[in-house]
């Protein structure tokens, strides 16, 4: 007699999201070196971070929300190389990051602008695990967009 299998889509979804939450928590633990512990704890469950750059006159730019991923002991996201944000970062502006919302508190980070198609694909996979629309193939980093110059990767690490 053949055993029947039973699949519960709701339970499968809940278990998948629980595994993702555990993975995000483990990735956030990798960031513990250098970032404030409360900041790292909030990153584990955050859907977006809020970022601002510093203008030439020393004032901060508008605070904007961005999707992000955690990999290789850093916070990563993408932006257009033509954005004000990217231009300021290329000239050496620090990036100020908040997890709780536009009002902070903010953590100052060091930024590396990266052009690497393989890393873009890896970040796309991280996004796909975190954001359902990225999982469906939309709004996710990719080798093609990075190598064509449509996006740059931004790697955020603690200011030492």
Residue spans for each PLM region:
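Bacterial N-terminal signal peptides that target proteins for export
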Residues: 2-15
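Bacterial N-terminal signal peptides
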Residues: 13-23
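Sec/Tat signal peptide C-region and signal peptidase I cleavage site
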Residues: 24-28
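Short, structured beta-strand-loop surface elements
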Residues: 29-30, 82-160
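Short N-terminal segments immediately surrounding and downstream of signal-peptide cleavage
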Residues: 30-50
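Short, P/G- and charge-enriched loop/turn segments at secondary-structure junctions
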Residues: 37-39, 55, 139-144
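Extracellular/periplasmic catalytic domains that process cell-envelope and extracellular macromolecules
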Residues: 42-44, 60-62, 69, 90, ...
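Short beta-strand segments
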Residues: 46-80, 95-98, 106-110
């Amino acid at each position: 007699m053949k055993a029947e299998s039973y699949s519960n889509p709701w339970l499968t979804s809940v278990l998948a999201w629980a595994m993702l939450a555990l993975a995000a928590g483990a990735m956030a633990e990798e960031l513990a070196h250098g970032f404030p512990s409360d900041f790292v704890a909030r990153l584990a469950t955050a859907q977006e971070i809020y970022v601002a750059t510093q203008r030439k006159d020393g004032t901060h730019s508008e605070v904007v929300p961005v999707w992000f991923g955690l990999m290789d002991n850093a916070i990563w996201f993408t932006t257009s190389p033509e954005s004000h944000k990217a231009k300021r970062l290329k000239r050496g502006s620090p990036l100020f990051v908040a997890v709780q919302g536009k009002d902070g508190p903010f953590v100052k980070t060091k930024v590396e602008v990266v052009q690497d198609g393989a890393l873009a694909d890896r970040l796309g996979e991280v996004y796909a695990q975190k954001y359902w629309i990225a999982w469906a193939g939309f709004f996710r980093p990719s080798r093609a967009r990075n190598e064509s110059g449509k996006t740059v990767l931004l790697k955020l690490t603690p200011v030492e």
